[in-house]
Amino acid sequence: MTFNPNIATHTLEAEGLRCPEPVMMVRKTIRTMLDGEVLLVTADDPSTTRDIPSFCRFMDHQLLGAQIDQLPYQYLIKKGLA
């Protein structure tokens, strides 16, 4: 799947934040979303390359794609069924 940020229904800019803040903000934002909606996260903390995929697995959300080749990193997360 090609990384396509245009499919996002919500966005979260977490640039400048450091662990654990980006994942905490992702969690807070996803809680306000409907099942199946897609969140685009933009971050520059290297720990997000590990923490966001782990968060998605643990919380049963789907990581649709990640762009981690250059800053800022971008992640597309589809909210799982509650």
Swiss-Prot record:
Signal peptide: none annotated. Gene3D superfamilies: TusA-like domain. GO terms for molecular function: sulfur carrier activity. GO terms for biological process: tRNA wobble position uridine thiolation. It is found in: Cytoplasm. The active site is at residue 19. Keywords: Cytoplasm. GO terms for cellular component: cytoplasm. PANTHER family: SULFUR CARRIER PROTEIN TUSA (PTHR33279:SF2), SULFUR CARRIER PROTEIN YEDF-RELATED (PTHR33279). Sulfur carrier protein which probably makes part of a sulfur-relay system. Belongs to the sulfur carrier protein TusA family. This is Sulfur carrier protein TusA.
